[in-house]
């Protein structure tokens, strides 16, 4: 049970920071427009530097000889997740099938796993580098494919290459090259300190932003429309937070990869959707309200479901804390 408690404490610590962001925006301590600046600071600067800092300090082909397999594991994960999402979409009405499917498929593959792994093992751990390699293409795929879920409901959009070739992708490639050629030995210590210190603000900043975004998306409605999609939301939470992790755990037991790969895969399967889902849905002319309810309900339920999944996972893949 200690694994459950340890994971629960890590999730609750993250929740506390998220609630602080929720409270700050809800009480108007700062304008909600400030979130746009903080989001840019976190995603375009702090998070890429966090990636670079970990790759510079922790990656080398000697330590991770099979590093190139991580993107392939992600591809396999994405294929299975897409198949599950499309299959489960027939459980809901056709009018909301696109919103249901996209929310199932696009997991919060980078932010929450960073926070969960950091909460469980501290910032200096052997799992962050494989995580960054695992999700190297994930943000690019999200930004280049989300319109496909809505088919003829939207006009064809031009690809935004700034989102596809995003700062996290660039940072991962740069850090990977530095590690492969052992150039980190020639980087001045003060530059590594700067990169590490700025990257360290990414974790709390991301949770503050998540809390603020949830308030803006869920609590503040100009049209005062309070419709709740209880049946659809319950169905979504059961599939996303329970069925997905159990299916992937069964596959892990069948394939028996090493602990690092297995842990990253099960965390990817257990986390809720990315918080940008309501924005994607609205941009595609879908039902933003139900998408917001999917995201928030999954986040709330994950407070208990993630520790439970990690506890069950630990029974088959013992985690060295």
Label the predicted regions.
Residues 1-321:
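Alpha-helical transmembrane segments of multi-pass small-molecule/ion transporters
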């Amino acid at each position: 049970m200690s694994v459950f408690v340890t994971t629960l404490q890590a999730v609750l610590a993250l929740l506390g920071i998220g609630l602080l962001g929720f409270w700050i925006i809800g009480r108007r301590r700062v304008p909600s427009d400030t979130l746009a600046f903080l989001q840019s600071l976190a995603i375009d600067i702090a998070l890429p530097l966090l990636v670079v800092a970990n790759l510079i300090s922790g990656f080398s082909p000697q330590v991770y000889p099979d590093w190139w397999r991580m993107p392939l594991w992600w591809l396999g994960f994405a294929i299975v997740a897409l198949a599950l999402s499309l299959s489960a979409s027939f459980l809901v009405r056709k009018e909301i099938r696109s919103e249901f499917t996209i929310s199932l498929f696009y997991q919060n593959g980078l932010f929450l796993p960073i926070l969960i792994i950091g909460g469980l093992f501290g910032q200096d751990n052997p799992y962050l580098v494989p995580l960054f390699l695992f999700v190297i293409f994930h943000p690019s795929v999200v930004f280049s494919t989300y319109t496909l879920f809505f088919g003829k409901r939207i006009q064809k959009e031009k690809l935004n290459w700034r989102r596809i070739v995003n700062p996290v992708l660039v940072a991962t490639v740069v850090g990977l090259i530095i590690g492969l050629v052992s150039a980190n030995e020639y980087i001045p210590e003060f530059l590594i300190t700067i990169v590490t210190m700025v990257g360290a603000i990414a974790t709390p900043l991301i949770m503050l932003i998540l809390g603020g975004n949830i308030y803006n998306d869920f609590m503040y409605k100009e049209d005062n429309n309070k419709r709740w999609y209880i049946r659809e939301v319950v169905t979504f939470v059961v599939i996303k937070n329970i069925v997905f992790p159990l299916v992937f755990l069964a596959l892990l037991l069948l394939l028996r990869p090493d602990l690092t790969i297995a842990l990253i895969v099960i965390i990817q399967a257990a986390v809720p959707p990315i918080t940008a889902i309501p924005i994607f849905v609205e941009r595609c002319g879908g039902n933003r309200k139900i998408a917001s309810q999917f995201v928030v309900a999954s986040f709330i339920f994950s407070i208990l479901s993630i520790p439970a999944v990690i506890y069950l996972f630990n029974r088959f893949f013992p985690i060295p804390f």
